[in-house]
Amino acid sequence: MALHVLDEANRCLGCKKPMCQQGCPIHTNIPEVIRLLKDNHLDDAGRMLFENNPLTTVCSLVCNHENQCEGHCIRNRMPSHDPVHFSIIEDYISTTYANKMTSGPAPRNGMKAAVVGSGPAGLTVAVLLARWGYDVTIFDARDKIGGVMRYGIPNYRLPDSVLDDFQYRHLELKGIHVRPNTAIGKTITIDDLFRDGYKSVFIGAGLWKANAMHIKGETLGNAAFGIDYLANSKAFQLGDDIAVIGVGNSAMDCARTAIRNGARHVTCYARRDESCISASAYEVSYAKLEGVGFRFCKAPVEIRENGLICRDTVKGEDGKFTQVEGSETFYPHTGVIVSVSQGSENSLVKTTTGIETNQRGLLTVNEDGSTTREGVFAGGDAVMGARTVVEAVAIAKKVAESMDAYMKALPADNTPDPYADIPVFSTPTSDVLAKQGI
């Protein structure tokens, strides 16, 4: 593995104006990382990666490299069209160096910050604020950290072990608290957080509400929404011939997961033609390689217990696709997965005064990530809609800096503790046991 990585690193031309770095949403200094590796300074290279991107072990596996660093590599312009595969290099350096990350928390500055959601944006903000001395608590509605990375990306692409290791090295060792199974906006509200001394709150909750197509049959037992299927695919009994409605990255994840779960036939349906596929070319090519089929210009109109009814669509001169009346066809399937898009949950907004949203239900923020409620910041999918992990990290880094500046500018809190001088209970832990002489 190491020799292969070095072979790949040696192909880097060390450009003075590195296009690869420009193509990276968080501007990773790729030439310098590669130079350090080639000079046998792996630890320095790893440190540089993690300082720039706390989720570098994740991004090395799930980033859309073909359109970012590798897609911008100058070697693409050569006749051989063979870019340096930095994803391989980043994965090797980050996973190797991560095992050496055992340092404890930074000195505390006396201020607390709350992070709602443990997806890529929330984890990035939490790690950075803790690095700068804040006492950070993460609140997440699920039992394990990771958000969409754990519950929306299949394990074959991003193993749970990567996120488990992240929790140990970047959260537990750094003193970051995690409250699982705690959905802010229900029992606990944003107002409660400020009451309990948090000086600032970051909202990084993801898009967990599946958007329905509102066609007949979506409630049937052989149907599922993509976001629910990916969260726990083994829980669904959809048979061995599955239709997937959608051709985005999540749809590819659903299709490839179904194959791994034993489906013999999986077919993706798209309302438009092949040029409108929104999934990455890599994901589509892997899906086809694994046996996933595609049907284009098919608009689903009804889900049935034994299949899917679609209507043909045609592309007009204006570029829009319209359905052809009378062209309905029944396609037999044992199960149907609807994977078209996701929306945001609004329980948090409903229970918090002063936070505004747009027509899509996404949070309204200023350039610095601040919401319309003082002290509350937001980023990631909750603001921009569905984005990639690295895009969420890039946004979160800027918001973390804004939160840091905001909290540093707050007046000192000199409110005395009304219970500072009360006596400390020092008798046996149980009065009952004490009375029994135990």
Range-by-range predicted roles:
Residues 44, 107, 112-116, 164-215, ...:
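Feature captures the FAD/FMN-dependent oxidoreductase FAD-binding
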Residues 135-138, 142-172, 178-179, 255-300, ...:
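Rossmann-like dinucleotide-binding cores of NAD(P)H-dependent redox enzymes
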Residues 254, 382-407:
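A conserved FAD-binding loop/helix module that cradles the flavin
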Residues 219-239, 321-386:
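FAD-site-proximal beta/loop scaffold in flavoenzymes
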Residues 111-137, 250-259:
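N-terminal Rossmann-like FAD-binding beta1-loop-alpha1 element of flavoenzymes
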Residues 1-9, 29-58, 79-106, 438:
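Ferredoxin-type iron-sulfur electron-transfer modules in oxidoreductases and energy-metabolism complexes
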Residues 92-107, 169-174, 178-186, 205, ...:
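Glycine-rich dinucleotide-binding loop and its adjacent helix/turn
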